[in-house]
Design a protein with these regions (language model features):
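Basic, low-complexity intrinsically disordered segments
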Residues: 1-124
Length: 124
């Protein structure tokens, strides 16, 4: 999947807007708001990615570099991939309303069976 520099800049601007409006980098921001922001970042990225690690690498590497230059850390390629994985596992934002931590959502996202994932969520 090829993406031009203008599209990358638009993605970058959209992500910056989300990070700043949700206070993602602020230590005082509640965890639920940070989780919502990560999900929203992934919702912006998902249409431009295929889910294929190799094909998505150039886009994620470019965005990661720009975001880390602006914010310091927290936007490495693995972090962006994690955001996408959680987004794909929980395509409806309402599915994130159970009060779990980001680490819980990451672990749940790795479960390929949707029904089992829901069962694990209820147990958590």
């Amino acid at each position: 999947m090829s993406i031009d520099s203008n599209e990358i800049q638009q993605l970058f601007s959209s992500i910056v807007s989300l990070v700043e409006s949700h206070g993602l980098q602020d230590k005082q921001t509640p965890a639920a708001r940070k989780i919502e922001c990560r999900w929203m970042i992934a919702s912006v990225l998902a249409p431009k990615t295929s889910g294929d690690r190799k094909a998505d690498a150039p886009l994620l590497e470019e965005l990661s570099g720009q975001l880390n230059s602006r914010y310091g850390r927290g936007f490495g390629v693995p972090c962006l991939r994690d955001m996408l994985e959680v987004y794909r596992a929980f395509p409806n934002k309402e599915g994130l309303g159970s009060g779990l931590s980001w680490a819980h959502y990451l672990a749940l996202a790795k479960e390929p069976n949707h029904e089992k994932r829901l069962l694990l969520m209820r147990k958590a």
